[in-house]
Amino acid sequence: VLAACSLIGTRELPGQAEPQVTTHFTASVRLSRVMPQAGRVELPEMTGHGIAAEDIYRVYFHGPAYRVLERAVVDPDGAAGFFAEGLPAEASAGRFDLWPRLIELCFQTAGVWDLHANGRMALPWQVDRVIVTPATVAAESLVAQVMPRAGGFDARVVDGSGNVWVELTGYRTTELPGQVEPSLLAAFGFAPRNP
């Protein structure tokens, strides 16, 4: 089954007769009776620049339920984002409550790398493909591995045994206007380049 999906928000604004309708995202979703098999990867050792959650969330604006990074490590080739334990329960708790947070873990880890490498803040714009695989074990030691690619990122979330839980390919962002405060960028290891 292939479904065309849209996330649409409607809000009434003061002084306007008609509600404002915004399409936030569109996607084609392929549903299958057979879940994809979880891949397995070797876990690389990350020895780059470490960034603590308190420094990340001085820049990021997420509330407690989506402060998914416990810490991150960045180097020129990519980033690792370590999933935070003990997040508040989601309002729609159930079997699938972990997947949005794991996708967000990829987004935020890519953002940390972008702050480190380019000193810029960006929001999600487009993802070419997302694959989620069935969880066969409890969520422990989950890590997002983010690899910069031409014009974007590829990412995956793996557990401590190397099992792949989520894969994103072709993730691209759009830069937010304005500059990040230089004193906040210092924690990310950003070093401005001389023109």
Give a label for each model feature.
Residues 1-195:
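Acyl-thioester-processing domains in fatty-acid/polyketide/NRPS systems
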